[in-house]
Every structure is written in C-alpha cells, then in structure tokens.
Amino acid sequence: MSKNKDQRTAKTLERTWDTLNHLLFISSCLYKLNLKSVAQITLSILAMIISTSLIIVAIIFIASANHKITSTTTIIQDATNQIKNTTPTYLTQNPQLGISPSNPSDITSLITTILDSTTPGVKSTLQSTTVGTKNTTTTQAQPNKPTTKQRQNKPPSKPNNDFHFEVFNFVPCSICSNNPTCWAICKRIPNKKPGKRTTTKPTKKPTPKTTKKGPKPQTTKSKEAPTTKPTEEPTINTTKTNIITTLLTSNTTRNPELTSQMETFHSTSSEGNPSPSQVSITSEYPSQPSSPPNTPR
C-alpha cells in the first residue's frame, strides 16, 4: 500500500510541476504585451504565486526522496542486527553434541575427534580463527595446506653380502697366484705397446681462382676528314684566242688599220695574257691606237 501511495504522489507532483511551468511561460509572454496597468499587475501576481508553488513542489520532492533513503537504511540495520543475534548454523544442526558457544576450545577438540573417527590415520592441524562479536564467538577451522616439496632421489642401498665382488677396469694377471676368481677377472698385459694413432688431417682442396677478364677497350680510329685539294683554275688562253680570231674576222672588212693593231695584239698575247677589258676596249674604239700591253715585271 505504501508503494502505491508513493507512486501516486510522485505522479501528482510531476503534473503540478509541468502545469506551473506552462503558466509561467504564458504569463511572461502576456506581460511583454502593452496591456493596461491592471492586467499587468494581475499577471505579475500570478507569476509570483506560480514561482512559490514551484519552490514548494521541489521541497516535497526532496523530502520524499530522503524518506525513501532513510527507510532503506533502517531495513539494512535491522537485517544486520538479526544476523548478529542468530547463532551459527553448524552448532544448532546437531543438538546431541551439547556445544556451548562460549567455549571455542571445546569446539576445536570435538572437531578433531570427529575427523579422527571418520578418517583414521590422518592427522591434520587446524588453525582456529575466533571472530568475537557482542554476544557470541564463532570459530572457523582451516586445515593447513600440504607442503609440496620435491623429494631427493636416494641411491639404492647395497646389500651387505660377503661374496660381493666389484669388477675393476683393469686387474693384471701377475697378481693372481692360485686364486681362480682372480684369474677369471684379470687381464693380461700385452707385450707390445700400442702405437700412436696417426691422425690424418683432411687436406683442403685448393679453390681455383677465377680471374674475370675485363672487357677490352674498343679503340675507335678517328676518321680523318677528307682533304680536298684546291683545283687549279683552267687557263683562259684558248678562250682568249678564239675571241681574238672572231674579232679579226669580223673587223677585217671594215677597218684595215684595226687589223694591223689586232695582229700586233695577237703577237703580244703569247708573251703576256691580256685582260678581257682590253679586248673589249679595242673592239669598241677602233680609231684610237691601242696601248702596248703591260708586261709582267
């Protein structure tokens, strides 16, 4: 019933909280409008009432939460007190034992007797830890953990027999006179001394050295540039003689004086090569006497 009441009150408080918030928002919006003085006064009064009611609702929320917390703490305290007041279960299960919880030494002695009766030949030391409370004392018996140590392997004991002979590595037969057991054990010394063993060391095979031949340098012969000899210019003697003969044949009929000059010029052409300019001058000016050709010095 109490849970249902708490849920109802919580729901009502939430609803009132929401409605009051909405009313505050509406009143603030209306207050911003330019209304008459009476309306503004009423809105301000409503806002004050709503704000105070919101504060009251918040206080109720906090008080209800604190009440729930205190109720849970009281329940926990009651449970712990009940646990402390109750006696241990392992004492109440067997009423025939007649154990009084005030004597922990009697409890440990009885536990050891029970263990000895159930498992004979086994003795385990128990560590009794007494936990003291206000009215009762409980003992918790913890057996010792078995120590795991590696046992050393002992050599087997030799039987104490009188007729036990130890065979040595080497017994010379010269010691044995008439003892048959000695003759059975002894060893004869060889006359020849064992020669030294010849140890042959393995000869290492010579590794053939491979010499890598380097690439031969390629010698490229530089090709000589072809030397072109200057060609001698052909002599113009033949051309000059042909020109002179044509001029003579053409002008013999016209001027007899010019023929004599050309003959003299032809005779001197063998000694010195006249220039073509001189030939053209003589042909253009036939009346003037031709100058003698310049002889080379």
Swiss-Prot record:
This is Major surface glycoprotein G. Residues 221-232 have a biased composition (Basic and acidic residues). One of its GO terms (cellular component) is host cell plasma membrane. Coiled coil: none annotated. Residues 67-297 are extracellular. GO terms for biological process: symbiont entry into host cell; virion attachment to host cell. Pfam families: Glycoprotein_G (PF00802). Residues 1-37 are cytoplasmic. It comes from Human respiratory syncytial virus A (strain rsb1734). The record marks 65-66 as: Cleavage. The keyword Secreted applies. InterPro entries: G_prot. Belongs to the pneumoviruses glycoprotein G family. Residues 254-288 have a biased composition (Polar residues).
